[in-house]
Regions:
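Compact, glycine-rich, soluble single-domain proteins
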Residues: 5-99
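N-terminal export/targeting signal detector
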Residues: 1-5, 132
């Protein structure tokens, strides 16, 4: 299978850097599968699960909001946070979900509602990814 270079960057670190066969990304309009030779494009991502396939092994992780640029020579994703399932603090994610649910209920404006809804999406996505782990 053809490979392409993938780099996933957060404000704190380079989460992933290497050649892959594919990556599935939670795009704002729905999941997007990127493979070698994909048409160049830029799109926004939303909180959810990513799946990276490298050397025939599929590995899943949580990805927060951000954007991705697909170029002929590389694909680069920028995200606020990306975590492997084993690095997700389930208790912290559950607490964040409860706080976000409360804030959504008490929202004061459309802007607050959108921010709180995004926080809730992040918490739900982390909790969905945590028990899944790796698929081999």
């Amino acid at each position: 299978m053809n490979k392409f270079f993938l780099e996933i960057i957060t404000p704190e670190k380079t989460f992933y850097r290497g050649d892959v066969e594919s990556i599935q990304i939670p795009a704002v309009g729905g999941d997007c599968m990127i493979m070698a030779g994909h048409q160049p494009m830029v799109f926004a991502t939303q909180p959810g699960m990513i799946a990276i396939t490298a050397d025939g092994q599929r590995r899943e992780a949580f990805m927060s909001e951000g954007f991705i640029e697909v170029r002929p020579d590389a694909t680069i994703a920028f995200s606020q946070a990306v975590e492997w399932p084993e690095d997700i603090d389930e208790r912290r994610a559950e607490e964040a979900k409860e706080r976000a649910e409360e804030m959504v209920r008490r929202n004061r404006s459309a802007a607050e509602y959108q921010l709180n809804r995004l926080a809730l999406q992040r918490a739900f996505a982390r909790l969905r990814v945590k028990p899944r782990g790796n698929k081999e």
